[in-house]
Each structure stands twice: as C-alpha cells, then as structure tokens.
C-alpha cells in the first residue's frame, strides 16, 4: 500500500490503518530511494512518534524528504529485527546508522583434499573443504602468520598445477621454506606429521606441541641424528617467538572483544579478535549517520550488521549494554544458524581488562579519525568556495583515462568523501570503438571483450582502437556514468573533476546537456610545461585560473588527480598484460580452449609455457611435435 503524499501528512494518513503489531517500516524519497528502515514493537505507536513536535533536526530532515511510506507486519520482535537488518544491508538507507567498509575477515585454510596439503589465505562466509583457522583482522595479519608458519613448518605454498609440473625443487626449497614434496624430498608420513603440528599450533595447543617436539628432539639426539635434532630445536625456538609476539590470552579462548566510544557525535567501534586463546588482530569501525543516536542504538545496529558478514565466536564481550540484548542475540543466532551465543558486559577481572584495552584503542582510533575528518572538512569547504558549490561536497568523483595511441584504452572513476578515498566506489570503464564489445565493472563479459580483441596474427587492441581520441573516451565514460546515475540518484556527486583541458570541458557540457543533468564539474589540466604545481582549472563561464602550489587545497586536488591517474595506469597495464598473454595462445591455429587449458594445467602458468622447450611442449596431451614447434615459434616471436 503506497500513498503519494509528503511528510507528516503522509504519516498521519498511514496511522489510520497502522496495526498495533511488531513490524518494519520503510520511508522513501521522491525517486523511490529508501531513506530509512525502522523496526517497531508496535507500528502504530512508533509511527505516531514522527508527528510529535519535539523531533531532532535529523528526523525533521528525513520526514521532509519522505514521499512514500510502506510497512510490513512480522510475527515477532526478533523477526522484525532480522528483517530490518537485512533491508539496511540491502538498501544502505541515508538516514540509518550504517556500517560501511565491513569486508569479511580472512582465514587461514589448510586443505585436506591433497596428499601434501597447503596453507592458503581464504576469505568468505562458507567454510568448507578444509580446516579453517581464524578469522584474522586483516590480510596483513594472515600474510604474516603464513610467512612465519612457512619458515617454521616448511609446508608447500604452490598451486596444484605448479606442484604437478615440477621436475626439480623450486626456490622455496633452496631458501629452506619448503621440503619439496613435489619431487619426493619428503615422504607422506613425515609431511602429515608436519601438518598435525601446524593444526596443533593454530588451535592453540602450543604447550603440547612444544612438549612433543622436545621429546622428538631428545630421541633424535640419542640416535646421533644431530642435524635433524637441531632443526627441531630451531622449530621450538621459532614457535616460542611467534607465540610471544602474537600474544596469548588465558582469559578468553574464542571471543570478540568490542568497545564503543563517542566524541562530538562521532562513534568508533573497535573489535579485537581472539581465537584459540591467541590474539588475531583488531580493527576500528566508524558507523555513519549517527547524529542524535545513543551508544546503545549504535552498538545494537553495529552488532546486527557486523555479524551478517562475520563468523560468530562463542562469546561476544562488549563495553556497553544494549537495550534489546535478548532479541539481538536471537537475531544473530538465526542469521548465522547457531544454537549458542553469549553477549556480556564484564565489570571486573581479566575480561574487563581486555574490554578496557579495546576501549583505549577505540578512543585513539576515534581521535585519529576526527583529526582526519576535520582536516578534510576544511579542504572541502575551500573546494566549495573555490568552485562556487552550493554546499560542502560529500562525494567527489575524479575521472581519467589511460591508453597507448588509443589502444588498450580504459577510463576510470575514483571517489573521495568526507574522510578520504572510498575505494569500493571506484569504477573502471573499458573504452571501445563502436564495433567492439565493451566491458566495465558495471556490465559486460570480459571473455567477450577478449574474444573481440584478438583476430588474425597480430595482437589487436583490447578495448578498441579509438585513435587516441581523448574526447571520445571521455564521452563514452560519462555517458555510461550518467546512465547509471539515473538508476542511482542517491550516488549523485557533489562535484566531478576531469583530468583534461578546455576541449574536455566542452565534451562534459555536451553529455550533461544530453542527459539534462546539472552536476557541478571542473577540468584540471597541467600547465604549459606540464609541470606539477602549475595546474590550470577550467570551469564553465570562468577564465582559466591556477592556484598557488603551496595551498593545501591545491595539494589536495593534486592528490585526487594523481589517485585517478595511477588507478587508470594500473588498469591499463593489467588489461594490456592480460591481452598479450591471451592473444599469444589464441592466435595459434589448432590451439583451442581444450589445448590451451591442457598447456596451462601441465605447466602451471603462462610463463612456464613460454619457458618450455619444443620437447617439453610435445609431452602435453593433445600436442604433437609439429604443433609444439608452432607454439614455440609463436611464443618466442618478437612483439
């Protein structure tokens, strides 16, 4: 049921039929974009609160923008909590407390489907086909742990293809980071013993592991096998060092320690991860849209959004009570399909000390965040004044392109917000000639693009040959971007910055007029000698101007431009490299998908195929000597 009236009158009209039952309501703006999702024990009472006179500014702004209102009845408060959390995650409403940049935490995965298992970094919600340890707070934590484990236990780190193709030990064996099971330098039984030791260490059974290793060292010494005994001794020392560096807790085994702090209306939630009694790192979060919100509200919304993506430990220990704790616990249990969960607020003892430590870290993180936020706001105000914007910009989109004489052309968009770059909003546009298939992060199939790029004997352009026409590239990128903005008006930028000059200004105006959109934009070009610090700014209706290179706003604009430039070059090189690799094999008559896969499977990588001799190529199933010679000649011809 939808009524097309606005604000408080809309809410009053909905109150007539609103039930006195639990449920979820949604407020929409004129474009049917979700402004707010809320839950209620009693929908009628909750909606009545919105027509009272003592509303805060945030709520007044929300009601003023509300043009449509819908609600759904639920069977229980827990069901309402679940539905609210799911809708917030799906729509990311402007006026809800949002947890952004919440990627799933990485794990260490021990494969169990191979005679010689390997340790891998794994990120994902589904934990299957292996033994998993973690989660860890960051990829860096996982990489560091994997490096230490490889030094100590020397398990293989290579892919199956690489493992199967080896005829001699690789460099990892030479630098004593692998026992080279690929060429039989260690038998299955001894390797399995190492795997068991890794499991014991990662599961926190370090005391038992060190005792077992000590017994083994003494046994080897008594047998006069001193070199092997010395290796075990070094392993014990390394384990002690890693254990000391990581930090071990006797207070908690599997728990998340979560502390929330507030300052000047901004919140920080710091999460410390403990698994098998070992500290697995910590990470701060800064929920948005927290104006006029309480700690209880912010922490409740945080927990519900956080544990939609993260694995839930046996215990969650927090520094502040939440109002609806029992229902929150039930909701998290249902989201993650678990039976047991405790959320506690300790007042004394070891757990209270861990919470206090998390709170101290949260305060430090928030102070650093606020310094960055304040500095960024000052710069944003200067940008507003410089380019005559109506308000301080909240979202700036910067555009650039990269190509070699029109080939392998890509356009990019990077996004900056209140506290810096928003990398999840970055976009890549593979610019193409009208006759070619295109691909971007937003649409298309990369294989179709590649298939369209390589025909004949030469390496053709990936992304189309548009003869180095920067204007056509920009026209395509902006056309696609503005088309998407019609579907996502809530992502409308406050300002667009284009790396270009007067000619680019005309192209932007042309595309804006075509779409009947009026987004503020400016073109930023290098000076006459293309020296940094002498950039020129081109704005419709104004003379070209430059800024003092020492001004903070000038330095900030240069940082924005450089970020877009580097992102464009990175993706251009990636596309070019991928195109060259694919085209070399695709250009060989008689080598289709099956033989190409056979080559890559046998040798393990494209580089290994290139390094292979004719004799080695002919060993691959389906490759005869004549075809091997053709492959060798094509792969070794000059570009």
Swiss-Prot record:
DNA repair as UniProt keyword:
yes
**Keywords from the named record:** Cytoplasm, DNA damage, DNA excision, DNA repair, Excision nuclease, SOS response
Which purpose does this protein serve, as stated in its record? The UvrABC repair system catalyzes the recognition and processing of DNA lesions. UvrC both incises the 5' and 3' sides of the lesion. The N-terminal half is responsible for the 3' incision and the C-terminal half is responsible for the 5' incision.
This chain belongs to the protein called: UvrABC system protein C
GO annotation, biological process: nucleotide-excision repair; SOS response
Q: Which GO terms describe its cellular component?
A: cytoplasm; excinuclease repair complex
Q: Which HAMAP family match?
A: UvrC
Q: Where is the GIY-YIG domain?
A: 20-97
Q: Which domain of life is it from?
A: Bacteria
Q: How does it assemble?
A: Interacts with UvrB in an incision complex.
The text of the family note is: Belongs to the UvrC family.
Q: Which organism is it from?
A: Rickettsia peacockii (strain Rustic)
Query: Which SUPFAM superfamilies did the record assign?
Result: C-terminal UvrC-binding domain of UvrB, GIY-YIG endonuclease, RuvA domain 2-like
Q: Which GO terms describe its molecular function?
A: DNA binding; excinuclease ABC activity
The UVR domain extends over 207-242
The cellular location(s) given in this protein's UniProt record come to: Cytoplasm
Q: Which SMART domains match?
A: GIYc
Recorded name of the encoding gene: uvrC
């Amino acid at each position: 049921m939808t009524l097309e009236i606005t604000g408080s009158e809309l809410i009053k009209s909905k109150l007539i039929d609103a039930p006195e039952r639990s449920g979820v309501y949604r407020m929409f703006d004129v474009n049917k974009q979700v402004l707010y999702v809320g839950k209620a024990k009693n929908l009628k009472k909750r909606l009545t609160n919105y027509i009272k006179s003592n509303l805060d500014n945030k709520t007044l702004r929300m009601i003023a923008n509300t043009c449509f209102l819908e609600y759904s009845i639920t069977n229980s408060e827990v069901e309402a909590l679940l539905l609210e959390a799911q809708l917030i995650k799906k729509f990311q409403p402007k006026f809800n407390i949002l947890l952004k940049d919440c990627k799933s935490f990485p794990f260490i995965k021990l494969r169990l489907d191979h005679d010689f298992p390997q340790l891998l970094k794994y990120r994902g919600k589904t934990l299957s086909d292996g033994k998993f340890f973690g989660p860890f707070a960051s990829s860096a934590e996982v990489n560091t742990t994997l490096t230490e484990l490889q030094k100590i236990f020397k398990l293989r780190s290579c892919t199956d293809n690489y493992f199967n193709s080896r005829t001699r030990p690789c460099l990892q064996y030479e630098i004593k980071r692998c026992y080279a099971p690929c060429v039989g330098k260690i038998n299955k039984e001894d390797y399995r013993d190492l795997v068991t030791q890794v499991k014991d260490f990662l599961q926190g059974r370090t005391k038992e592991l060190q005792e077992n290793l000590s017994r083994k060292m003494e046994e080897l010494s008594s047998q006069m096998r001193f070199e092997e005994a010395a290796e075990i001794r070094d392993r014990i020392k390394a384990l002690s060092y890693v254990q000391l560096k990581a930090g071990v807790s006797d207070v908690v085994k599997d728990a998340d320690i979560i502390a929330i702090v507030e300052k000047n209306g901004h919140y920080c939630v710091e999460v410390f991860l403990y698994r098998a009694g070992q500290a697995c790192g910590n990470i701060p979060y800064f929920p948005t849209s927290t104006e006029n919100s309480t700690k209880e509200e912010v922490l409740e919304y945080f927990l519900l959004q956080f544990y939609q993506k993260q694995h839930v430990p046996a215990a969650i220990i927090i520094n502040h009570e939440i109002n609806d704790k029992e229902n929150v616990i039930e909701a998290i249990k249902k989201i993650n399909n678990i039976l047991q969960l405790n959320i506690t607020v300790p007042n004394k003892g070891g757990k209270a000390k861990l919470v206090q430590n998390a709170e101290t870290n949260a305060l430090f993180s928030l102070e650093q965040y606020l310094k960055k936020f304040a500095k960024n706001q000052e710069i944003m105000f200067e940008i507003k004044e410089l380019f005559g914007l109506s308000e301080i910009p909240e979202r700036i989109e910067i555009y650039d392109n990269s190509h070699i004489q029109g080939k392998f052309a890509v356009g990019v968009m990077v996004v900056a917000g209140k506290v810096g770059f928003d990398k999840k909003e970055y976009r890549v546009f593979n610019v193409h000639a009208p006759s070619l298939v295109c691909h971007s992060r937003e649409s298309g199939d990369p294989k179709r693009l590649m298939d369209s790029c390589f025909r004949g004997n030469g390496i053709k352009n990936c992304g189309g040959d548009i003869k180095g026409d920067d204007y056509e590239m920009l026209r395509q990128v902006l056309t696609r971007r503005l088309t998407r903005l019609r579907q996502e008006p809530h992502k409308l930028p406050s300002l667009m910055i284009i790396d270009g000059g007067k000619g680019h200004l005309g192209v932007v105006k042309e595309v804006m007029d075509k779409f009947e959109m009026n987004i503020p934009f400016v073109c930023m070009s290098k000076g006459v000698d293309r020296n940094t610090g002498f950039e020129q700014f081109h704005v419709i209706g104004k003379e070209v101007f430059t800024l003092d290179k020492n001004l903070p706003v000038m330095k900030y604009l240069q940082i924005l431009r450089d970020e877009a430039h580097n992102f464009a070059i990175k993706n251009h090189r990636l596309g070019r490299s991928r195109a060259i690799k694919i085209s070399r094999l695709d250009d060989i008559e008689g080598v289709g998908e099956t033989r190409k896969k056979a080559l890559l499977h046998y040798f393990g990588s494209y580089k290994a195929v290139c390094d292979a001799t004719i004799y080695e190529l002919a060993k691959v199933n389906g490759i005869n000597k004549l075809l091997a010679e053709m492959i060798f000649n094509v792969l070794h011809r000059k570009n």
